[in-house]
């Protein structure tokens, strides 16, 4: 069975005109007849290409301010016609076959992303004819080639060159898959937008106002992720896995990072690298975060990245073995040398990597070196957690407090140095699994207690960690990701030598907790913000 199909007639109708002129010129050189609409047709005609307006092809003008342009049997019959089966019907209705459809859709996403977008603006950017043609061509991929991405123009031309102006079923099927994904994402965006609007009063005279109150979350949740890579296995070797990225998020991340060298990233590598990178983003000055099993085991500020790394490593060298290291500045040669000479590391990630640092890390061929780019601001987005039979959706935890937000509740006021350490410690605690306790001193973690069912045991573990590494807890500060339900955590901290505590507050026993701090001569501040992490 011959599955190669010649392209003799193409319909081009695009909102994003990137590369369309050059593509059309190449099609014309192949002898392809060009049909087009609106602005696309004008662009091609202005550059001397023979183009037939869709309205001339159908014999029916565009109507309703362009809302109806291509919804016509001569268009859709030409796309949907089954070659070798529907020729008699086509001849009877004067329908000509359309072999290639090149369409991308009205820019709905960028329209509604504009804070000044009205409901009317959104409605006028809902494409009707475009998705209809895309779906028709994708459905009939047995005979028709559909292109929705400008990045595929060169691929189609290469295919035509190889096959004397024709395309194979293989490429048509692959392009059809991309087309269905494209329309699914488009419809999902529209459904999400409208699902976020709550009808206040259907009988109001001001329809725009009635429909423009926004809800927190849509009635149905539509999101599309694109597979970036298959993974060797999942969290455990008996689990299959793949890594998908969110095309709507434009932010420096492990998902957008470029791997410069090393073995393929594993499922756990990706999860741990995300935890390390998101933590280090919290700091302005040179900072290093070392993560093991999604928990920071060492975090520090420094006069430069080398100093920050040395101090972060000092917190827990044992746990740092085989860990993930993240920086918030360009990885330099000195820091790279210190890492590869000192420890086994799975992943290093930084906004950028100097050539000298690349050359040094290259000596350890298995080390995964990632460059994620600089970050300016954090993108507002959602966190997801699957439960059996459902999905939990919430805003990302981007909350953080500054000096103006905290409240001193103890008799003793924190010193200026303690306040700096408190805010540093609080940033770290946000990224430690609950129950989370972090000891810190002079911009460096001293001990980290993570993931315990009892808060007091997390505090004890942080102290044990510090003791094991010979770090002095005396006059360190402590952060707790949630309030203390009993005074035992305060007593344990005092016994370890903690001088100051930062915590959310909000316990029914707050007075008892504050009294305990006062008894020990400790300073205590409340943030009014919790940072549970599960």
Curated annotation (Swiss-Prot):
**A GO cellular component annotation in the UniProt record:** cytosol
SMART domains reported in the protein's UniProt record? AICARFT_IMPCHas, MGS
UniProt protein name: Bifunctional purine biosynthesis protein PurH
Query: Domain text from the record?
Result: The IMP cyclohydrolase activity resides in the N-terminal region.
- Organism encoding this protein: Shewanella denitrificans (strain OS217 / ATCC BAA-1090 / DSM 15013)
The catalytic activity of this protein is classed by the Enzyme Commission as 2.1.2.3, 3.5.4.10
What are the boundaries of the signal sequence? none
Q: Name one GO molecular function term.
A: IMP cyclohydrolase activity
- Which HAMAP family does its entry note? PurH
Membership in a protein family: Belongs to the PurH family.
Q: Which domain of life is it from?
A: Bacteria
- Any one Pfam family match given in the protein's UniProt record, by short name: MGS
| Gene (UniProt) | purH
Keyword check for Transferase: yes
GO biological process terms, alphabetically, are: 'de novo' IMP biosynthetic process
* NCBIfam families xrefs: PRK00881.1, purH
Quickly give the catalysed reaction.
Answer: (6R)-10-formyltetrahydrofolate + 5-amino-1-(5-phospho-beta-D-ribosyl)imidazole-4-carboxamide = 5-formamido-1-(5-phospho-D-ribosyl)imidazole-4-carboxamide + (6S)-5,6,7,8-tetrahydrofolate; IMP + H2O = 5-formamido-1-(5-phospho-D-ribosyl)imidazole-4-carboxamide
Q: Cite the entry's keywords alphabetically.
A: Hydrolase, Multifunctional enzyme, Purine biosynthesis, Transferase
Q: Where do the MGS-like domain residues begin and end?
A: 1-148
Pathway(s) of this molecule: Purine metabolism; IMP biosynthesis via de novo pathway; 5-formamido-1-(5-phospho-D-ribosyl)imidazole-4-carboxamide from 5-amino-1-(5-phospho-D-ribosyl)imidazole-4-carboxamide (10-formyl THF route): step 1/1; Purine metabolism; IMP biosynthesis via de novo pathway; IMP from 5-formamido-1-(5-phospho-D-ribosyl)imidazole-4-carboxamide: step 1/1
């Amino acid at each position: 069975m011959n599955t190669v199909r010649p392209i003799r007639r193409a319909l081009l109708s695009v909102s994003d005109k990137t590369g369309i002129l050059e593509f059309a010129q190449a099609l014309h050189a192949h002898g392809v007849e060009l049909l087009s609409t609106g602005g696309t047709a004008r662009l091609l005609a202005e550059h001397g290409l023979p183009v037939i307006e869709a309205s001339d092809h159908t014999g029916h003008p565009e109507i309703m301010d362009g809302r109806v342009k291509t919804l016509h049997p001569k268009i859709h019959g030409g796309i949907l016609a089954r070659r070798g089966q529907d020729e008699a019907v086509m001849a009877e209705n004067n329908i000509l076959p359309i072999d290639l459809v090149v369409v991308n859709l009205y820019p709905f996403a960028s329209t509604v992303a504009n804070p000044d977008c009205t409901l009317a603006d959104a409605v006028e950017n809902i494409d009707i004819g475009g998705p209809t043609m895309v779906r028709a061509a994708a459905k009939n991929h047995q005979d028709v080639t559909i292109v929705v991405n400008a990045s595929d123009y060169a691929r189609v031309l290469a295919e035509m060159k190889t096959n004397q102006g024709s395309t194979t079923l293989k490429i048509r099927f692959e392009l059809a898959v991309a087309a269905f994904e494209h329309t699914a994402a488009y419809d999902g965006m529209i459904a999400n937008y409208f699902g976020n609007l709550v009808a206040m009063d259907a009988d109001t005279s001001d329809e725009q106002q009635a429909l423009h109150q926004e809800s927190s979350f849509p009635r149905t949740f539509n999101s599309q992720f694109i597979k970036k890579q298959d993974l060797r296995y999942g969290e455990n070797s008996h689990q299959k896995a793949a890594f998908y990225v969110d095309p709507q998020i434009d932010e420096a991340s492990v998902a957008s990072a470029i791997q410069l060298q090393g073995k393929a990233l594993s499922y756990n590598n990706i999860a741990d690298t995300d935890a390390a990178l998101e933590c280090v983003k919290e700091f302005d000055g040179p900072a290093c975060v070392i993560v093991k099993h999604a928990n920071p085991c060492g975090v520090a500020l420094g006069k430069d990245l080398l100093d920050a790394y040395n101090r972060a490593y000092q917190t827990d060298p044992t746990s740092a073995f085989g860990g993930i290291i993240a920086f918030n500045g360009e990885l330099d040669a000195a820091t790279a040398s210190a890492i590869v000479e000192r420890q086994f590391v799975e992943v290093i990630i930084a906004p950028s990597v100097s050539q000298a640092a690349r050359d040094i890390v290259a000596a350890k061929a298995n080390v995964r070196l990632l460059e994620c780019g600089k970050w300016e601001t954090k993108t507002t987005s959602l966190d997801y957690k699957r439960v059996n039979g459902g999905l939990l959706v919430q805003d990302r935890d981007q909350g953080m407090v500054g000096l103006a937000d905290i409240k001193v509740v103890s008799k003793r006021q924190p010193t200026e140095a303690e306040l700096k350490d408190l805010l540093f410690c609080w940033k770290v605690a946000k990224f430690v699994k609950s129950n989370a306790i972090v000891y810190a001193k002079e911009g460096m973690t001293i001990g980290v207690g993570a993931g315990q069912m009892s808060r007091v045991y997390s505090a004890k573990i942080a102290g044990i960690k510090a003791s094991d590494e010979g770090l002095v807890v005396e006059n360190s500060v402590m952060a707790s990701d949630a309030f203390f339900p009993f005074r035992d955590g305060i007593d344990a901290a005092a016994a370890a030598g903690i001088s100051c505590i930062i915590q959310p507050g909000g316990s029914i026993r707050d007075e008892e907790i504050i009294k305990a701090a006062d008894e020990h001569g400790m300073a205590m501040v409340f943030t009014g913000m919790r940072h549970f992490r599960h």
